[in-house]
Amino acid sequence: MQLKNPILGLCQQATFMLSAAKVDQCPDDEGFEVAFAGRSNAGKSSALNTLTHASLARTSKTPGRTQLLNFFKLDDDRRLVDLPGYGYAKVPIPLKQHWQRHLEAYLGSRESLKGLILMMDIRHPMTDFDLLMLDWAVASGMPMHILLTKADKLTYGAAKNTLLKVQSQIRKGWGEAVTIQLFSAPKRMGLEEAYTVLAGWMELADKGAEAEA
């Protein structure tokens, strides 16, 4: 019998918990959280919705509409967090600065945060925002996994070449700790690999092994 990834059922039952403008409005800091970050228009909300098989994360034709930390409950101990998108020119500078302060406070203080999924548009990877997130994750010892989103926008060969190029750049600058994969929400490409990362961070891998038959 083929194993069913243990995180899949939890993601499919994900429900919205709350939105927080600052850290003291977040849920109790216990259990397991995985946060999703990405520059505006990197496909973050689409990736979250595909992973949860639902329309949980807000999508918009205007990037940067997500201004809050949005928490989604998987079970009593596990949550996904949609972080504010950054970099869209139409967002006023004071609002960008407000987002940045509270994002830094969340990332720097959250004990339950077990890993960070960073979305990069495969056509425009390694932006200044991406480099800052990589620097922070490696310096703080936070596990990071990168989704090169919108991989369906390129031919498979071009997507694979970009993956190898970015992977090489990351290894040279940040070491082996950061992992990376191709991802496409509309084509459902890379789901199993992403689920495996989530299951490991949320300590569900052993439960998957128990289900083997």
Swiss-Prot record:
Alphabetized, the UniProt keywords read: Cell cycle, Cell division, GTP-binding, Magnesium, Metal-binding, Nucleotide-binding, Septation
Q: Which residues bind GTP?
A: 38-45, 64-68, 82-85, 149-152, 182-185
Which NCBIfam families does this UniProt record tie to the protein?
A: GTPase_YsxC
Q: Name one GO cellular component term.
A: cytosol
Tell me if Ubl conjugation is a UniProt keyword of this record.
no
Q: What does this protein do?
A: Necessary for normal cell division and for the maintenance of normal septation.
Q: Which family does it belong to?
A: Belongs to the TRAFAC class TrmE-Era-EngA-EngB-Septin-like GTPase superfamily. EngB GTPase family.
Q: What is this protein called?
A: Probable GTP-binding protein EngB
Q: Record-annotated residues binding Mg(2+)?
A: S45, T66
EngB-type G domain: residues covered: 30-204
Alphabetical list of InterPro entries matching this protein? G_ENGB_dom, GTP-bd, GTP-bd_ribosome_bio_YsxC, P-loop_NTPase
The record's Gene3D superfamilies line, in alphabetical order, gives: P-loop containing nucleotide triphosphate hydrolases
Query: What is the source species?
Result: Pseudomonas fluorescens (strain ATCC BAA-477 / NRRL B-23932 / Pf-5)
Cofactor(s) needed, names only, are: Mg(2+)
Keyword Cell cycle (UniProt): yes
List GO molecular-function terms, semicolon-separated.
GTP binding; metal ion binding
Q: Which HAMAP family match?
A: GTPase_EngB
Taxon lineage:
Bacteria, Pseudomonadati, Pseudomonadota, Gammaproteobacteria, Pseudomonadales
Query: What PANTHER family does the database record attribute to this sequence?
Result: ENGB-TYPE G DOMAIN-CONTAINING PROTEIN (PTHR11649:SF13), MSS1/TRME-RELATED GTP-BINDING PROTEIN (PTHR11649)
